[in-house]
Amino acid sequence: MSHTSLLKAARPAWRASAAISKAATRPFSVCSQLRAAAPILLEDKEKGFGFIRHNNRPPKPRSVGVTEIRGPYYSAMGKRYLQDVLETMGHHVDGLKFAGGSFSLFPEDKLKELINLAHEYNVYVSTGGWMEHVLLQSDPVWAVDQYLKKCKQLGFDVIEISSGFLSIPQDDWLRIVDKVHAEGLIAKPECGIQFGAGGDTEASELSSLGTSDPSKIIHMGKRFIDAGVERIMIESEGITENVQSWRTDVIQQILRELPQEKVMFEAADPKVFNWYIREFGTDVNLFVDHSQIVQLSCLREGIWGQSDTFGSVVNYRP
């Protein structure tokens, strides 16, 4: 069986299911043992800094203004490290992503500790784009089944489905989405214009590979939404990362055609997420490194910023 096709060529074209699974329609993160969250000082009008002007943000689980953070990848992260992040900034964190296959390097009990801790703070937990590696196994259908079952048993909420390194038929991509939803998990496709994105490839090599037409993202995005996908991740390579000049035209084109709440942008640099907040406001969904959560949250709240955003990021929520 070809590594780039899950099903035989004779299989009929994919069609959207008549009934979207419950997994595809529930909030990203559901936990019955949430910690009681103390109000942050900025929202405490009686004893804190609530008298300072700031932007009103929706409570979790949010569908707009979502912030997903990268967990262990550039640095190791255990329970104590994550506890520090969530005890201080958990109010601002919506999702935790284990980049690539980083989660496979953990002892199972330690990985579950991180996942369970995230859930206590109403933070959903997502895999990285390891599905690409799973599809390269000699029997990809069996491997995908085993992968999803194990991820569910570990406590993951969201399965990222990337294809930055693979050429895969669009219908097969949608079949994987259906399979993820059928397992009671949430599919989060990752799309981009740069082939070879999502790894540690040098910028010069990425440039030589060329880019795809942005209309491909838009076409697939619409099909994913029809399949019940709640949110699509947009890869930064080729758009705002490893490029001589940002492809803001691609971003604008995506948001002209796809609902903003259905899209999340990877923002790998403070200048990038500063631009997203400036251009699209506090409700834009962003994926950043966990080390950047404070800086991004200051921007969303409208209490700090760079020269072009300081004191100018506002919303109106009567």
Across the structure, where does each feature detected by a protein language model lie?
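Active-site mouth loops of central-metabolism enzymes
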Residues: 63-80, 99-103, 126-143, 166, ...
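Conserved N-terminal beta1-alpha1 strand-loop-helix module at the mouth
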Residues: 37-113
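N-terminal mitochondrial targeting presequence
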Residues: 1-40
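C-terminal alpha-helical cap/extension of soluble enzyme domains
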Residues: 41-58, 255-318
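Conserved anion-binding
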Residues: 158-239
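Hydrophobic faces of well-ordered beta-strands that scaffold small-molecule active sites
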Residues: 64-71, 94-98, 125-129, 159-161, ...
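Active-site-adjacent beta->alpha loops and helix N-cap segments on the catalytic face
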Residues: 104-115, 136-145, 165-185, 195-199, ...
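Acidic (Asp/Glu)-rich catalytic clusters
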Residues: 83-90, 109-122, 145-154, 176-184, ...
